[in-house]
Design a protein with these regions (language model features):
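Helix-loop interface residues and adjacent transmembrane-helix termini in multi-pass membrane transporters
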Residues: 3-6, 125-127, 154-156
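Small-residue-rich hydrophobic transmembrane alpha-helices
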Residues: 9-77, 113-132
Length: 196
């Protein structure tokens, strides 16, 4: 469907694996956030304290994503093309596309990390599963997929613009997630009392 689709697929196969390696740390922070928030609520902490802990976990995730994203973005144009790409015999065009993909991933990794910790960790950990699901799924189906399809399949703008459409999901999730976080409505005590 797109010009250079063979190179795009080869680049995506490699970039996707490198992205998955970076995602391990992001998901670890998100899972930890869920545990910490659930513990704070379960111990009967007041809403202001739980809110502050949620903000702290989101900030930690943002910092983690910023460090990993910087490492990935710099690596995409320095050591990955010389040390990793040759192992997979990527063509020069596929190497360039892989570096572009990894740069997009790196630039938006801090935002993605924040969103994961906020939605999967803080909101779900606070018992706000319904809002977390809506914030997580809606931008994918109403923003990212339609924009990526429009840019790539209808307008045929190329893989750069397809990635612009894909990462737009993270921007929408950020604003929806921040709105929900600031509302404080996500703090729900879902613990059960011990039977007497």
């Amino acid at each position: 469907h797109m010009a250079g689709s063979t190179e795009i697929l080869a680049a995506r196969a490699l970039a996707g694996n490198i992205e998955d390696i970076c995602s391990v740390a992001i998901f670890a922070v998100a899972a930890t956030s869920s545990i910490v928030i659930g513990r704070e609520i379960g111990q009967g902490r007041d809403s202001a304290t739980v809110y502050d802990v949620g903000k702290a976990m989101d900030t930690l995730a943002l910092a983690c994503g910023l460090v990993l994203g910087t490492f990935l973005t710099v690596g995409a144009w320095t050591w990955l093309p010389t040390a990793v790409y040759p192992i997979f015999s990527l063509s020069p065009q596929a190497s360039s596309i892989a570096s572009m993909m990894l740069s997009f991933t790196g630039v938006f990794l801090a935002l993605r990390s924040f969103n994961s910790a906020n939605i999967v960790g803080v909101l779900r950990g606070g018992g706000d599963v319904r809002a977390a699901a809506v914030i997580d799924i809606t931008p994918l189906w109403l923003v990212a997929i339609p924009l990526a399809a429009l840019f790539g399949l209808v307008l045929r703008w190329g893989i750069f613009w397809v990635y612009v459409g894909i990462v737009s999901e993270q921007v929408v999730k950020f604003f929806l997630g921040m709105w929900r976080l600031r509302s404080g409505a996500w703090i729900n005590d879902v613990t059960r009392s011990a039977p007497s």
